[in-house]
Curated annotation (Swiss-Prot):
Subunit structure: Homodimer; homodimerization is required for ufm1 activation. Interacts (via UIS motif) with ufm1; binds ufm1 via a trans-binding mechanism in which ufm1 interacts with distinct sites in both subunits of the uba5 homodimer. Interacts (via C-terminus) with ufc1.
Name of the protein in question: Ubiquitin-like modifier-activating enzyme 5
Gene this protein is translated from: uba5
Organism: Danio rerio
Entries under PANTHER family matching the protein: UBIQUITIN-ACTIVATING ENZYME E1, UBIQUITIN-LIKE MODIFIER-ACTIVATING ENZYME 5
Motif placement: UFC1-binding sequence (UFC): 383-398
Renumbered ranges of motif UFM1-interacting sequence (UIS): 330-342
Reported phenotype of the disruption mutant: Morpholino knockdown results in seizure-like behavior and decreases locomotor function.
One of the GO BP terms on file: response to endoplasmic reticulum stress
Entry function: E1-like enzyme which specifically catalyzes the first step in ufmylation. Activates ufm1 by first adenylating its C-terminal glycine residue with ATP, and thereafter linking this residue to the side chain of a cysteine residue in E1, yielding a ufm1-E1 thioester and free AMP. Activates ufm1 via a trans-binding mechanism, in which ufm1 interacts with distinct sites in both subunits of the uba5 homodimer. Trans-binding also promotes stabilization of the uba5 homodimer, and enhances ATP-binding. Transfer of ufm1 from uba5 to the E2-like enzyme UFC1 also takes place using a trans mechanism.
Listed transmembrane segments: none
GO cellular component, one term: nucleus
GO MF annotation list: ATP binding; protein homodimerization activity; UFM1 activating enzyme activity; zinc ion binding
Keyword Translocase: no
Length: 398
């Protein structure tokens, strides 16, 4: 007699077969354009790449065709992940690996990409079907499972390390578009162990803010270096969920965060512009904070600490480049009249008005110092027995 796990596996296989048969039927009904072997800059209505190739003509990107040589893994095909996958597909990425265990629901329709008739299908298969119709030149690989389980995590690590555009090579980038901290920590652990560069993204529970973050193992802070409170406190986030209560979701915020993420991906892969290490988005004030976070030497992830040690060794071995200071150009070489600028404050007065410089961490300076209090400045006028009239008479004589 078959076990429960075997039955579940068989059900999953049958569901995937049903999805594939529906896709074949749908593909036959729809007219999918033939594959394009080489990107062209020719401006004609039938060329889907003409406006992308215009970036090369305008001097933004040197070699846009290079995008076809990259493989990107997208983990989480929800509000942010599905739009991210769509944008990368339209940009002509070489290969997309999609990971998600969830199914399309009518509750997802407030977000972008998915359509009502896809309800009940797995998100990865529904996404692959739609994306292949958009751009058949892109190679797709889908995995319908939860990466946080032991067996699936092992398979996930195997695919991101061997599922590149050329089989056996690693992917070029992993994009985290998941909506829970457990999955983020799983991706973080895998990338630290493999030394894989990845980008993390997220939208707040109230749907009016979000962020993207580039994580380079050993060089920048990983997700475990500065974890959210729910992770640092070892709280099981499943206990925080309540029946009948869900997080808010806006397609506008999802679209903005997905756009910022893909823009950063393109800049990183194609080498143009400035790649953001961390970029936040606050929709209430239209505020976009940007920063870079250093790796935590006391990080709980041992693979992160190992990557930090390897990065420090590489930096120490790298030859230091001498910085040549340019001499300031003299505006007026001749000073016929011998004019000089003289300060109104002497050096002694300046020292008296300044205080000691405090001991501060490296990189921090003070704008000014506070002078020490003079012990004699607190002296008061001696008391006198003279009357007010006598004092006024003395002042008149002065």
């Amino acid at each position: 007699m078959a076990t429960v796990e075997e039955l579940k596996l068989r059900i999953r296989e049958l569901e995937n077969e049903l999805i594939k048969s529906k896709q074949k039927q749908s593909d036959a009904e729809h007219n999918i354009r033939p594959k394009i072997e080489q990107m062209s800059a020719e401006v004609v209505d039938s060329n889907p790449y003409s406006r992308l190739m215009a970036l090369k003509r305008m001097g933004i990107v040197q070699d846009y065709e290079k995008i076809r040589s990259f493989a990107v893994a997208v983990v989480g095909v929800g509000g942010v992940g599905s739009v991210t996958a769509e944008m990368l597909t339209r940009c002509g990425i070489g290969k997309l690996l999609l990971f998600d265990y969830d199914k399309v629901e009518l509750a997802n329709m407030n977000r972008l990409f998915f359509q009502p008739h896809q309800a009940g299908l797995s998100k990865v298969e529904a996404a692959q079907h739609t994306l292949r119709n958009i751009n058949p030149d892109v190679a797709f690989e889908t995995h319908n499972y939860n990466i946080t389980t032991m067996d699936n995590f092992t398979h996930f690590m195997d695919r991101v390390s061997h599922g590149g555009l050329e089989e056996g090579k690693p992917v070029d980038l992993i994009l985290s578009c998941v909506d829970n901290f457990e999955a983020r920590m799983a991706i973080n652990t895998a990338c630290n162990e493999l030394g894989q560069i990845w980008m993390e993204s997220g939208v707040s529970e109230n749907a009016v803010s979000g962020h993207i973050q580039l994580i380079i193992p050993g060089e920048t802070a990983c997700f475990a270096c500065a974890p959210p409170l729910v992770v640092a406190a070892n709280i099981d986030e499943k206990t925080l969920k309540r029946d009948g209560v869900c997080a808010a979701s806006l397609p506008t915020t999802m679209g903005v965060v997905a756009g910022l993420l893909v823009q950063n991906v393109l800049k990183y892969l194609l080498g143009f512009g400035t790649v953001s290490y961390y970029l936040g988005y606050n929709a209430m004030q239209d505020f976009f904070p940007s920063m870079a976070m250093k790796a935590n030497p006391q990080c709980d992830d041992r693979h992160c600490r190992r990557q930090q040690d390897e990065y420090k060794k590489k930096e120490a071995e790298r030859p230091k480049q001498e910085v040549v200071q340019e001499e300031e150009e003299v505006v007026h070489e001749d000073n016929e009249w011998g004019i000089e600028l003289v300060s109104e404050v002497t050096e002694a007065e300046l020292q008296d008005a300044s205080g000691p410089i405090p001991d501060l961490p490296e990189g921090i300076t003070v704008a000014y110092t506070i002078p020490e209090k003079d012990g004699g400045s607190g002296e008061t006028v001696e008391e006198t027995e003279q009357s007010l009239e006598e004092l006024m008479a003395q002042m008149k004589k002065i």
